[in-house]
C-alpha cells in the first residue's frame, strides 16, 4: 500500500509518491488484463493501461501468464485475446477441417483430441494418418450434426478449448455464449498461400499448447520447394500455360470451382497454369455452359468431391455431359491425392502438392521429378514412415469415401 503523506512534504517527495501510485495502478491493470477477468469497465486511466497492455501482447504474438499462473493468454488469428488453461487435456477441432491432421502430427498423438468434424474423420479414415496416429479414428464427431454445431453434445465432451475456422463468426458466437474457450485458425490471412498458412497454424498450435514447433522443418522445406519451382518457371522464359479448372466441390448436381482468393489460385499460379475461374471469387457455383466456354486443358478434382476422373472421362455423371471438354477428351483429368490429409487445402503434405501439380501443369519442365519416390522420401524424412506400394497406390488413387459425400 502507498502511505498517505502531508502536502508540506515537498516537491521531491510528492513526485516519489505519484510514481509509486502510478506503479501500483499499472501493475493492477496489467494483472487484470492478463487474467481476462475484468467484467466491468474500470476508471478511464486503468482502462487505458489495460488497452495498451493488450496491444503490446498482440504485437508480440506471445503468451502472457495470468497473475495466478494457471492460465495464459494467446492472440488467435482473429486478433482476439483468448484466456486458456495452461494445462490443456481435452481439445475439439471443429470447422477448420485440415487441422486435426496437422495437430496429430504436431503432437505425435490424438490422445487429447476428443472431437473433430465428420468431414475431417472421412479424410482421416481414408488417409495414411492412422498409420502414424492410430487413435485418430476413435475421436468423437457427434457434436456436429448436419453441419450444425450441437452445443449440448459439445459440452458433454468437456473441452478445454475448441479450435475453429476464424472466418466462422456464427460458430464463435455460439462457443462464446456457452463459455467455451475458442481459438480461431485463419485460412485467408496469408493470401491463401498454403505454405504460409500451414506455417502459421503450427505456430499458433505451439503458442496454445506451450510447446515447441515440431513441424517447422515442413514449412521450411515448403518454402524451398516453392522457390525452386518459381526459379525453374522463370528460367524457362515465355512458356505456354495450360488452362486449368479445379472442381472444388462437385456433388449432387452442384459444381463449385476454386476462383481467385482461394487455395486453387495459389496452386495454379505457383505451378505454371492459368486458372480459368480467376475472374470469380472464392468457391462459386458454376454450370456446364460456363465450362464449355472455358474449355479447360486440365481438370483437377479435389477430395471434397466423390467423383473420380473416370466418371468424367466415361461421361457417366447424370445430367452433365463432359464429352466435348478438351481436358476430358485428352484424358487430362486428375484427382488430388490424399496422404496425411486431402492435398487441396493447406496441410502437412503441402510441399508434395506443389511438386505434383508442377509435373502435371508443366510436365516437360519438371520431367525429372519422380513423384512416387518424392512421396516415399518425404514420408520417411518428416513422419518416419516407410510407405509400401499399397500405401503409394492409396495416396495417388484416393477413395471417393474420403469426401464424406455420395455420388
Give the residues covered by each predicted segment.
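Bacterial N-terminal signal peptides that target proteins for export
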Residues: 12-25
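A short, structured surface patch at a secondary-structure boundary
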Residues: 94-153, 161
Amino acid at each position: 500500500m502507498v502511505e498517505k503523506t502531508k502536502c508540506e512534504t515537498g516537491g521531491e517527495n510528492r513526485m516519489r509518491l505519484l510514481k509509486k501510485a502510478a506503479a501500483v495502478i499499472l501493475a493492477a491493470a496489467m494483472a487484470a488484463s492478463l487474467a481476462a477477468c475484468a467484467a466491468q469497465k474500470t476508471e478511464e486511466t486503468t482502462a487505458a493501461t489495460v488497452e495498451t497492455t493488450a496491444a503490446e501482447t498482440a504485437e508480440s504474438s506471445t503468451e502472457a501468464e495470468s497473475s495466478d499462473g494457471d492460465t495464459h493468454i494467446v492472440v488467435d488469428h482473429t486478433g482476439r485475446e483468448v484466456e486458456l488453461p495452461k494445462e490443456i487435456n481435452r481439445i475439439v477441432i471443429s470447422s477448420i477441417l485440415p487441422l486435426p491432421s496437422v495437430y496429430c502430427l504436431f503432437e505425435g498423438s490424438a490422445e487429447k483430441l476428443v472431437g473433430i468434424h465428420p468431414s475431417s474423420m472421412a479424410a482421416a479414415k481414408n488417409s495414411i494418418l492412422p498409420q502414424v496416429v492410430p487413435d485418430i479414428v476413435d475421436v468423437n464427431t457427434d457434436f456436429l450434426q448436419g453441419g450444425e454445431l450441437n452445443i449440448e453434445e459439445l459440452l458433454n465432451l468437456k473441452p478445454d478449448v475448441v479450435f475453429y475456422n476464424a472466418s466462422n463468426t456464427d460458430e464463435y458466437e455460439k462457443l462464446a455464449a456457452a463459455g467455451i474457450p475458442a481459438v480461431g485458425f485463419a485460412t485467408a490471412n496469408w493470401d491463401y498461400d498454403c505454405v504460409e498458412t500451414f506455417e502459421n497454424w503450427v505456430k499458433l498450435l505451439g503458442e496454445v499448447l506451450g510447446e515447441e514447433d515440431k513441424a517447422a522443418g515442413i514449412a521450411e522445406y515448403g518454402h524451398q520447394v516453392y522457390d525452386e519451382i518459381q526459379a525453374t518457371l522463370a528460367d524457362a522464359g515465355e512458356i505456354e500455360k495450360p488452362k486449368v479448372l479445379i472442381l472444388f466441390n462437385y456433388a449432387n448436381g452442384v459444381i463449385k470451382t476454386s476462383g481467385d482468393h482461394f487455395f486453387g489460385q495459389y496452386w495454379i499460379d505457383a505451378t505454371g497454369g492459368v486458372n480459368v475461374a480467376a475472374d470469380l471469387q472464392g468457391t462459386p457455383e458454376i454450370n456446364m455452359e460456363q465450362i464449355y466456354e472455358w474449355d479447360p486443358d486440365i481438370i483437377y478434382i479435389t477430395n471434397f468431391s466423390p467423383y473420380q476422373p473416370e466418371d468424367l472421362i466415361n461421361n457417366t455423371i447424370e445430367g452433365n455431359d463432359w464429352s466435348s471438354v478438351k481436358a476430358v477428351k485428352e484424358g487430362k483429368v486428375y484427382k488430388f491425392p490424399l496422404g496425411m490429409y486431402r492435398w487441396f487445402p493447406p496441410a502437412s503434405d503441402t510441399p508434395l502438392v506443389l511438386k505434383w501439380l508442377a509435373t502435371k501443369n508443366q510436365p516437360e519442365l519438371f520431367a525429372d521429378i519422380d513423384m512416387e519416390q518424392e512421396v516415399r522420401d518425404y514420408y520417411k524424412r518428416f513422419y518416419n514412415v516407410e510407405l509400401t506400394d499399397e500405401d503409394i497406390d492409396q495416396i495417388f488413387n484416393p477413395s471417393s469415401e474420403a469426401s464424406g459425400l455420395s455420388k
